[in-house]
C-alpha cells in the first residue's frame, strides 16, 4: 500500500511525517510539572535535535486524567497548560503535541497545538473522535493496549468519515497478563499497512501498569534496546519522554529517559533509522 505523508507546517518549514522519511521525534515530558521545568526540558530537546538534524515536536500533557490513584498529580489543567504551551512555541519556534480527554477540550487545544493526541484508553470513544476530527488538526492515535493492531483501521475509518485523514498511528504496547506490556513488532508492521505514518512510543511501552500498587512501574533500564528494535522497522517517528530527575518525576518516572542521556540515545536511534531506510525493500511474499 502507498504510504501517506503528513505535512506539518511550521515557521521553520514543513516537517514531513511518513514511514519512508527520516524519523520525527515526538518528545518532551509526561506531564507539565511547572512552567520553568517545561521550558528547561524543551530547550534541551531543541538544542539536541537541532544538533543532530532530527525534526522535532514538543510533547507534554496538561492533565493526566487516567492516573491509577485519585491522589496522583494530574497537571496544571487546560487553561494554565495552554499558556505554557504558547510560551514554549513562541520561545523555541517548535510545534506541539498534547492529548485531550473530553469533547470540550478539542477546539481550544487545537488553537494552540499542532497535533492532538487521542489517548489509548479513549481511542474507541466516538464522540471524542468526531470532535477531534472536526478541528482539522493532525491527530495522533494511541493504540489501545487491549486492541489488536489490525483493528486500528476501525478508528481510522471513524476519523475519515468525520472528515479528517491527517492521522498518525502510535504503538505503545499490548497487555500481556496482569501488570505487563509487550510490543508486537510484526503488529506494528501491520499498522504500517494502513498506509498511515506509524510512530513508536518507546516510553510507555516500558510500563508495568499498576506495578507500584497506586501507580505504574516501568523498565527504564531497557529504554535503548526497545527503541532500537522499533526503529529497525522503518517507521515515521519515535515518541519518548525524558526528565532531569526521573525518580522524582510526578508521573511515569520509572519509564522516563534521564534527560542527560538524550543526545547519546538519539544518536543511536538516528543511526538505526538512517541504516534501515537506506535498504531497498524486499518482497518476501513472492
UniProtKB/Swiss-Prot annotation:
GO molecular function: 3-deoxy-8-phosphooctulonate synthase activity
Cellular-component GO terms for this entry: cytoplasm
Biological-process GO terms, alphabetical: keto-3-deoxy-D-manno-octulosonic acid biosynthetic process
Subcellular location: Cytoplasm
Cross-referenced SUPFAM superfamilies: Aldolase (SSF51569)
Catalytic activity field: D-arabinose 5-phosphate + phosphoenolpyruvate + H2O = 3-deoxy-alpha-D-manno-2-octulosonate-8-phosphate + phosphate
UniProt entry tagged with the keyword Secreted: no
Signal peptide (UniProt feature, chain positions): none
EC id: 2.5.1.55
Keyword Thylakoid: no
Entry keywords, A to Z: Cytoplasm, Lipopolysaccharide biosynthesis, Transferase
Pathway membership: Carbohydrate biosynthesis; 3-deoxy-D-manno-octulosonate biosynthesis; 3-deoxy-D-manno-octulosonate from D-ribulose 5-phosphate: step 2/3; Bacterial outer membrane biogenesis; lipopolysaccharide biosynthesis
Pfam families linked: DAHP_synth_1
Family membership noted in the UniProt record: Belongs to the KdsA family.
Name used for this protein in its record: 2-dehydro-3-deoxyphosphooctonate aldolase
Species, as recorded: Shewanella denitrificans (strain OS217 / ATCC BAA-1090 / DSM 15013)
Gene that encodes it: kdsA
